[in-house]
Amino acid sequence: MKEVSVPAIKRIVLIAHDNRKEDLVNWVKTHREILSKHQLYGTGTTGKLISEETELPVYRFLSGPLGGDQQIGAKIAEGDLDIVIFFWDPLTAQPHDPDVKALLRIAVLYNVPMACNRSTADYMISSPQFTKTYKKILLSYNTKVKKD
């Protein structure tokens, strides 16, 4: 196990499937004051929409189906993102479903909190840990991965 310090100013990635974008934008508007104190990231379309609707700066990766989910997964693996807010659509098949599953796996692997709906996002943002430095524990999977 390894302890990693998560800074008080969080690096938060905001993602939403098409049918959930409006819900995510409304959630960001509700929590604009808190979110304005953190660094925001997003997939291409979602990030642009949030930035336009809230006037918050959002660094944008590619659109999810064009590789944005994979870019975000890489940033999580590199320790460059702290929180994932991903309002995904459970009723619509996505062309990049394997990428979404990989992103979920990487978030769990690196112990990055992920909210997949508004209720979980509300609990997360209202946590006292949200605005403080936080020590997270990373499990060592090196011994679990078979080496060739």
Curated annotation (Swiss-Prot):
Signal peptide: none annotated. It catalyses: dihydroxyacetone phosphate = methylglyoxal + phosphate. One of its GO terms (biological process) is methylglyoxal biosynthetic process. GO terms for molecular function: methylglyoxal synthase activity. Disulfide bonds: none annotated. The active site is at residue 69. Keywords: Lyase. Residues 4-148 form the MGS-like domain. Its EC number is 4.2.3.3. The keyword Lyase applies. InterPro entries: Methylgl_synth, Methylglyoxal_synth_AS, MGS-like_dom, MGS-like_dom_sf. This is Methylglyoxal synthase. The gene is mgsA.
